[in-house]
UniProtKB/Swiss-Prot annotation:
<keyword id="KW-0658">Purine biosynthesis</keyword>
<protein>
    <recommendedName>
        <fullName>Phosphoribosylformylglycinamidine cyclo-ligase</fullName>
        <ecNumber>6.3.3.1</ecNumber>
    </recommendedName>
</protein>
<dbReference type="GO" id="GO:0046084">
    <property type="term" value="P:adenine biosynthetic process"/>
</dbReference>
<dbReference type="GO" id="GO:0005829">
    <property type="term" value="C:cytosol"/>
</dbReference>
<dbReference type="InterPro" id="IPR004733">
    <property type="entry name" value="PurM_cligase"/>
</dbReference>
<dbReference type="GO" id="GO:0005524">
    <property type="term" value="F:ATP binding"/>
</dbReference>
<dbReference type="GO" id="GO:0004641">
    <property type="term" value="F:phosphoribosylformylglycinamidine cyclo-ligase activity"/>
</dbReference>
<dbReference type="GO" id="GO:0006189">
    <property type="term" value="P:'de novo' IMP biosynthetic process"/>
</dbReference>
<dbReference type="InterPro" id="IPR016188">
    <property type="entry name" value="PurM-like_N"/>
</dbReference>
<keyword id="KW-0436">Ligase</keyword>
<comment type="pathway">
    <text>Purine metabolism; IMP biosynthesis via de novo pathway; 5-amino-1-(5-phospho-D-ribosyl)imidazole from N(2)-formyl-N(1)-(5-phospho-D-ribosyl)glycinamide: step 2/2.</text>
</comment>
<dbReference type="InterPro" id="IPR036921">
    <property type="entry name" value="PurM-like_N_sf"/>
</dbReference>
<dbReference type="GO" id="GO:0004637">
    <property type="term" value="F:phosphoribosylamine-glycine ligase activity"/>
</dbReference>
<keyword id="KW-0547">Nucleotide-binding</keyword>
<dbReference type="Pfam" id="PF00586">
    <property type="entry name" value="AIRS"/>
</dbReference>
<keyword id="KW-0067">ATP-binding</keyword>
<dbReference type="InterPro" id="IPR010918">
    <property type="entry name" value="PurM-like_C_dom"/>
</dbReference>
Length: 341
């Protein structure tokens, strides 16, 4: 017996790397040293920094992958993977430099995984970061047929004096919201349960979604905010703090960019909750509090700025074609998010 008979096709793995090589290298930016295939990826720290600090992050896509498996649509989850990582490090003010991925599957299916990598490449291009390397692990007997798991890792850079860590946030500051593109990559265990409970298929087209299938709606990739936020930073917008609204929604993520003696008062009347979330709440009979605690509810990213600059900053985002609105105010408190009834 050999390794292939045991379920691991080494030649298929080599062929897969050759197939994706050009696509991966299309993400390269200044700083990348060498090419694909080495034991480690090399990246030169950009010039011009006095005290450069590297910011790292890692994340996955969660059970959203189950929808990709069940619909055989794999071209968007790679974007999700990059988005979940780069949006996180962006909150520190970091510019993403490079990205690494880990892809594990029971049996290597080249066409399927090429779709996944194409999505990762697209996410890296949207973020301006290089796909510096990755690992594709074929693990027979470990995953169900046709299924895979993903993990991503990114590294960015910021000047030490410009790190955003919440210490600059002051009572009276205003929170500016940037919209999400949908559920993003959190809350899918509840989403899938609601679909199952109502005996729906991912091919179904509820009237609420204007001709789109449930699969199309829920596989919409996570919005990447790098261009918007890096643009704001380069335009010298005075930003005191930022939050990426992921698992736990606004209640869990907003306090992460506040000081211990601060809370955030949110005004939900400042935006219309997207139809998608209203549909989920109705179909799943989900309590209002659970909706806020699980989903982003239409707010994907929050930027905290000084009150006198808030209107001007909202106008700046809109001038760049980015929807934005004033969503709340920093108040004295103990790390709570107020106003979400």
């Amino acid at each position: 017996m050999d390794y292939q008979q045991a379920g691991v096709d080494i030649e298929a793995g080599r062929s897969f790397v050759k197939t994706i090589k050009d696509n991966v290298e299309s993400t390269y930016r200044p700083g990348v040293l060498g090419g694909l295939g080495g034991f480690g990826g090399c990246f030169e720290i950009p010039a011009g920094y006095r005290q450069p600090v590297l910011i790292s992050g890692t994340d996955g896509v969660g059970t959203k992958l189950k929808i990709a498996h069940q619909t055989d649509q794999h071209h968007t989850v790679g974007i999700d993977l990059v988005a979940m990582c780069v949006n996180d490090i962006l909150t520190s003010g970091a510019e993403p430099l490079f990205f690494l991925d880990y892809l594990a599957t029971g049996k290597l299916e080249p066409e399927q995984l090429a779709q996944v990598v194409a999505g990762i490449v697209e996410g890296c291009k949207q973020s301006g970061c290089a796909l510096l390397g990755g690992e594709t692990a074929e693990m027979p007997g470990f995953y169900q047929a046709g299924e895979y798991d993903l993990a991503g890792f990114c590294v960015g850079i910021v000047e030490k004096s410009e790190i955003l860590d919440g210490s600059q946030v002051q009572v009276g500051d205003v929170a500016i919201a940037l919209p999400s593109s949908g559920v993003h990559s959190n809350g899918f265990s509840l989403v899938r349960k609601i679909i199952e409970m109502n005996q729906l298929s991912w091919d179904d087209k509820p009237a609420a979604f204007q001709g789109k299938t449930l699969g199309e709606v829920f596989l919409t990739p996570t919005q990447i905010y790098v261009q918007a936020i890096q643009g704001a930073l380069k335009a010298k917008m005075e930003i005191h703090g930022m939050a990426h609204i992921t698992g736990g929604g606004l209640p869990e993520n907003l306090p992460r960019c506040l000081q211990a003696n601060q809370s955030m008062a949110i005004d939900p009347s400042t935006w219309e909750i997207p139809t998608l979330f209203q549909w989920l709440q109705t179909m799943g009979d989900v309590p209002q509090a659970a909706m806020w605690d699980t989903f982003n509810m239409g707010v994907g990213y929050v930027v905290i700025v000084p009150a006198p600059k808030a209107a001007e900053n909202v106008a700046w985002f809109k001038a760049q074609g980015i929807a934005a609105w004033q969503v709340g105010t920093v108040v004295a408190g103990q790390g709570e998010v107020l106003g979400l009834q």
